[in-house]
């Protein structure tokens, strides 16, 4: 309800401005002035000076969407009037106070199946005006007593019909375009985009408004459905924040699939990429401390490590935390004097990392920390050797060089599916089984 109240506050501010733009047509008619017969009056230059909406509310309307209700609204209308009977002409200014205005409207929420875009329409609207009071600013105000009831009734009926017209129009011309700022498909880089389209119409219940988004990465050049399905999510019922966003492991794992298939996880390391202060070096001399045959066969040469991810990394979220596993092939080469490469060995690396996910500027950001690293010798051109001899070097290379580069990219952030100008604050992130739950308050501006 806190989120609905804030949305109500923002929406009613827009509606108020639109209602104050109502154009009221001139009102003309005849009146009787005994014993002199009939006269004519005309009310013109009518302007809505203020339209106050003091008690707005938005409530959930199950199976429809939202119900907007406003009570005790009041309107001030100003203008000019003139009356004539024979050679007698009078004119002046007037104020009309319209009080006790009540408005009720249902906003039906839906979606366009072909695009997954959210829609909102005004499915019903009614308004009622309790009373209208006419006051003249001229010394001829007594003339108004001859026809004030007709004017009050006419202007009350006019305002009654205009209110729902304006509300319905505002929903289609203001609210719907704003809803359309919810991102559908957003290209992130030359490789991937993210699909946030709706997979079903929004669903209103007695205590929540739920939207199911696809939450899937896709290859911008060759989009294709992933070979796995999203896991079910048992989302807890929480009400401390305005909105809650459940982010399934499916989102992150489709990202891993797309980037791995595009070859974006490849990385080449050379000695000049190792921190200068480090004792560990990518040279045959340093490698020869663990593998003497390397230094003998390729003396005083630099070493190149080429890393490629052999299968998509897999992220798993549990209440205890977030883990990511990856299988990496590491090919080691000696760089010969003519800059050609001589293959040394091929290792298979199984990485177990812990992941921290946070937020920055309305984006999800991540950071990986190396946990356990398991080595396997897949092929060797320098003879067989125990892979444990390279454990310390590989731990260092992964922790000091590879993961910092990965984390640098993860800090660029993943945009959250928020409409335009919505900012999040008071964020809280909770890991659950197979999904991450983000709770936040929102502000517009």
Swiss-Prot record:
Residues 426-445 are annotated as: Central sheet, part 3. Pfam families: LBP_BPI_CETP, LBP_BPI_CETP_C. Residues 198-203 are annotated as: Cleavage sites for elastase. Residues 249-419 are annotated as: C-terminal barrel. One of its GO terms (molecular function) is lipopolysaccharide binding. GO terms for biological process: defense response to Gram-negative bacterium; innate immune response; lipopolysaccharide-mediated signaling pathway; negative regulation of interleukin-6 production; negative regulation of interleukin-8 production; negative regulation of macrophage activation; negative regulation of tumor necrosis factor production. Coiled coil: none annotated. GO terms for cellular component: extracellular space; membrane. Residues 184-248 are annotated as: Central sheet, part 2. Restricted to cells of the myeloid series. Its main location: secreted. The keyword Lyase does not apply. Disulfide bonds join 125-164. It is found in: Secreted; Cytoplasmic granule membrane. Keywords: Antibiotic, Antimicrobial, Disulfide bond, Glycoprotein, Immunity, Innate immunity, Membrane, Secreted. Glycans are attached at residue 352. Belongs to the BPI/LBP/Plunc superfamily. BPI/LBP family. The cytotoxic action of BPI is limited to many species of Gram-negative bacteria; this specificity may be explained by a strong affinity of the very basic N-terminal half for the negatively charged lipopolysaccharides that are unique to the Gram-negative bacterial outer envelope. The N-terminal region may be exposed to the interior of the granule, whereas the C-terminal portion may be embedded in the membrane. During phagocytosis and degranulation, proteases may be released and activated and cleave BPI at the junction of the N- and C-terminal portions of the molecule, providing controlled release of the N-terminal antibacterial fragment when bacteria are ingested. The N- and C-terminal barrels adopt an identical fold despite having only 13% of conserved residues. Monomer. Homodimer; disulfide-linked. This is Bactericidal permeability-increasing protein. The lineage of its organism: Eukaryota, Metazoa, Chordata, Craniata, Vertebrata.
């Amino acid at each position: 309800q806190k989120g609905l109240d804030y949305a109500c506050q923002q929406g009613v501010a827009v509606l108020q401005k639109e209602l104050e733009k109502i154009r009221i047509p001139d009102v003309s008619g005849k009146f009787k002035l005994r014993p002199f017969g009939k006269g004519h009056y005309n009310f013109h230059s009518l302007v809505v000076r203020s339209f106050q909406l003091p008690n707005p509310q938005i409530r959930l309307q199950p199976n429809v969407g939202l119900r907007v209700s406003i009570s005790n609204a009041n309107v001030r209308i100003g203008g000019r009037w003139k009356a004539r009977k024979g050679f007698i002409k009078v004119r002046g200014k007037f104020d009309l106070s319209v009080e006790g205005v009540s408005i009720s409207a249902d906003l039906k929420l839906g979606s366009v199946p072909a695009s997954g875009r959210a829609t909102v329409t005004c499915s019903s609207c009614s308004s009622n005006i309790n009373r209208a009071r006419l006051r003249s600013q001229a010394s001829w105000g007594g003339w108004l007593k001859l026809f004030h009831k007709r004017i009050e009734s006419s202007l009350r009926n006019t305002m009654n019909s205009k209110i729902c017209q304006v509300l319905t129009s505002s929903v289609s011309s203001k609210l719907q375009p704003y809803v359309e700022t919810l991102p559908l498909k957003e290209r992130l880089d030359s490789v991937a985009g993210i699909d946030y389209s709706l997979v079903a119409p929004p669903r209103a219940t007695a205590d929540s408004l739920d939207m199911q988004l696809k939450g899937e990465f896709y290859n911008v050049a060759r989009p294709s459905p992933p070979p796995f399905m999203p896991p079910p999510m048992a989302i807890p019922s929480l009400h401390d924040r305005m909105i809650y966003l459940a982010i399934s492991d499916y989102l992150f794992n489709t990202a891993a699939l797309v980037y791995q298939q595009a070859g974006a996880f490849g990385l080449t390391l050379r000695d000049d990429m190792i921190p200068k202060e480090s004792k560990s070096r990518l040279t045959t001399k340093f490698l020869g401390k663990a593998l003497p045959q390397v230094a003998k066969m390729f003396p005083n040469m630099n070493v190149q490590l080429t890393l490629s991810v052999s299968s998509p990394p897999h992220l798993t979220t549990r209440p205890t935390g977030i883990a990511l596993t990856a299988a990496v092939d590491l090919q080691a080469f000696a760089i010969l004097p003519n800059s050609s490469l001589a293959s040394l060995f091929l290792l298979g690396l199984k990485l177990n990392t812990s992941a921290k996910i946070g937020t920055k500027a309305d984006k999800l950001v991540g950071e990986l920390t190396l946990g356990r690293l398991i080595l396997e010798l897949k092929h060797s051109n320098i003879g067989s050797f125990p892979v444990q001899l390279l454990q310390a070097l590989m731990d260092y290379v992964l922790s000091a060089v590879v993961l910092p580069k990965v984390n640098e990219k993860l800090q660029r952030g993943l945009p959250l599916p928020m409409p335009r100008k919505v900012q999040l604050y008071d964020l809280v992130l909770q890991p659950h089984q197979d999904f991450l739950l983000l709770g936040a308050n929102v502000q517009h501006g």
